[in-house]
Swiss-Prot record:
Belongs to the TrbC family. The gene is trbC. The chain crosses the membrane at residues 7-27, 50-70, 79-99. This is Probable conjugal transfer protein TrbC. It comes from the Bacteria. It comes from Sinorhizobium fredii (strain NBRC 101917 / NGR234).
Length: 127
């Protein structure tokens, strides 16, 4: 048997053992990442009720300045547009929450899934 064939056969025999010993190390999870905590706090601050009130006040004040502000210079007008858009973006999550949308819902839950069994209520009760 040549040296090359011997090396290939040893490698083929050893590879399942090596892969089996590495699998637990690859499957372990390190927990959460260090930046997830602060990002979750920012997200909770932006989507809370206080942020909704701040967004409403920002939209009202910026809109009032743009409508009744008279002669604003270009910088002040652009600043009011930025405040107006920021208020709308902060308030958008609150507005979506008012309509009952809390997150993605893919598929039906078990209690809402249609059943193939006849129902004992309503028109399904034949007897």
């Amino acid at each position: 048997m040549s040296r090359k064939n011997e090396f290939i056969s040893i490698a083929l025999l050893a590879s399942p053992l090596i892969l089996a010993s590495v699998a637990p190390a690859l499957a372990s999870s390190g927990g959460s990442l260090p930046w997830e905590g602060p990002l979750e706090q920012i997200q909770e601050s932006i989507t809370g009720p206080v942020a909704g009130y701040i967004a409403l006040a920002a939209v009202a004040i910026a809109g009032g300045m743009l409508i009744f502000g008279g002669e604003l210079n270009d910088f002040a007008r652009r600043l009011m547009y930025v405040v107006l858009v920021a208020g709308i973006l902060l308030g958008a999550t609150t507005i979506v929450g008012l309509f009952g949308a809390t997150g993605a819902s893919i598929g039906l839950t078990n209690d809402r899934a249609t059943s193939t069994r006849p129902s004992a209520e309503g028109e399904g009760a034949h007897g």
